[in-house]
Amino acid sequence: MPRAPRTYSKTYSTPKRPYESSRLDAELKLAGEFGLKNKKEIYRISFQLSKIRRAARDLLTRDEKDPKRLFEGNALIRRLVRVGVLSEDKKKLDYVLALKVEDFLERRLQTQVYKLGLAKSVHHARVLITQRHIAVGKQIVNIPSFMVRLDSEKHIDFAPTSPFGGARPGRVARRNAARKAEASGEAADEADEADEE
């Protein structure tokens, strides 16, 4: 059976000036604050933001009663509010232009897990997510960059299959428990022998 050709498009764009020191410092600070793996994660979100802002700018050039502006503008705003990037009281295209990369980074699963107190740090949150300890609702999510919707935020918790979520302890914990039980069993045997003498 023939396969349809897939067209892939880039999900990020690199900066035009690679060694601009002010931008490098800002990116490093962002990567540290949000526990990002590399700069590409920042570039990906910048790329998404630039597409959203371009769409908003295009719609703002049209007349307020233009059906395209009404339909597409409301759809864009509704999508951003659902993700939690735009607040309920700022439902205007002008506010879309004021969005920053940090607003999107705040909505990542990695950041949300840390903010909810399930992890000790953002880096620990990333490890928990990639090791499949975190679930959103009933679905285990192992992608740290997963964008959490506002209505899903309250469903973030440890997965039922995770030792942190009350499931069977991990391999090392089981081994340590067995050793402890074995040691306490030996101590009890020695105590019995001492009593007999």
Curated annotation (Swiss-Prot):
Disulfide bonds: none annotated. InterPro entries: Ribosomal_uS4, Ribosomal_uS4_CS, Ribosomal_uS4_euk/arc, Ribosomal_uS4_N, S4_RNA-bd, S4_RNA-bd_sf. The keyword RNA-binding applies. One of its GO terms (cellular component) is cytosolic small ribosomal subunit. Residues 187-197 have a biased composition (Acidic residues). It is found in: Cytoplasm; Nucleus, Nucleolus. One of its GO terms (molecular function) is structural constituent of ribosome. The modification Phosphoserine is found at S184. Component of the small ribosomal subunit (SSU). Mature yeast ribosomes consist of a small (40S) and a large (60S) subunit. The 40S small subunit contains 1 molecule of ribosomal RNA (18S rRNA) and 33 different proteins (encoded by 57 genes). The large 60S subunit contains 3 rRNA molecules (25S, 5.8S and 5S rRNA) and 46 different proteins (encoded by 81 genes). Interacts with snoRNA U3. uS11 interacts with MPP10. Component of the ribosomal small subunit (SSU) processome composed of at least 40 protein subunits and snoRNA U3. Component of the ribosome, a large ribonucleoprotein complex responsible for the synthesis of proteins in the cell. The small ribosomal subunit (SSU) binds messenger RNAs (mRNAs) and translates the encoded message by selecting cognate aminoacyl-transfer RNA (tRNA) molecules. The large subunit (LSU) contains the ribosomal catalytic site termed the peptidyl transferase center (PTC), which catalyzes the formation of peptide bonds, thereby polymerizing the amino acids delivered by tRNAs into a polypeptide chain. NCBIfam families: PRK04051.1 (NF003139), uS4_arch (TIGR01018). This is Small ribosomal subunit protein uS4A. The lineage of its organism: Eukaryota, Fungi, Dikarya, Ascomycota, Saccharomycotina.
